[in-house]
Amino acid sequence: MSELCLTLLCPPAIEEKLLDLLLLSPNATVFTSTPTAAHGLAFGSFNQTEQVLGRAFATQVQVIFSDTDKAALLARIQQQFAGTGLRYWVTPGVEAGEIA
């Protein structure tokens, strides 16, 4: 069984709802979230600070999950967040584990 890493780039307005979905998802083995700056993407109207800086405030979420759960996890996210500006990409998890 291979693991994948789903990276989500979400606007601040949907951050809590996305994190809640992942907390309740049996498909999300472990995930992290961190504030980040998004370049080249528009999450609706930039505020004045974002216009001056040339970047939008966002949250990056990375989720480790089994490749067999990919379709179900993405379908659930797409169902709840269609049209919100949430972006994603999936990469292979070459190796993951806990340092014991």
Where are these regions (language model features)?
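Positively charged, small/polar-rich N-terminal and surface patches that mediate targeting and assembly
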Residues: M1-A100
